[in-house]
Amino acid sequence: MPRATGNFEVTLNPLDNNPGIEGLGRMSIDKQYHGELEATGQGQMLTGGTTIKNSAGYVAIERVTGSLKGRKGSFILQHNGIMTRGTGSLVITIIPDSGTDQLDGLRGTMSIRIEGGKHFYDLTYTLGTA
């Protein structure tokens, strides 16, 4: 499977929360991807925290618009993250059939790592009808 790698910057901003629902939050996502994916990402994240330190979860939907190895278009990522007392897992999937223009038929997954405060992505994908 082809891969695309690079780094990104992310800005999260709180949005209006559901009044009266303790432990839940909502944020906007704004990203700038660099490397083999040159794009912007915009979306929303829902979070849930617990009274136990470092235990939480989030889901997010993000539209990515730009170019993937020179192919222009957009696609949608679905994030599902969970942290259990500091041990985390994250699954980020390209929503099937969300690719547009030259990214029509894009499918795959993205992983994220943070090193020295900097964010990196690794996108594994296929392109074409399935």
Task: Label each residue range with its predicted role.
Residues 1-130:
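Targeting-peptide/extracellular-domain and disordered-appendage signature
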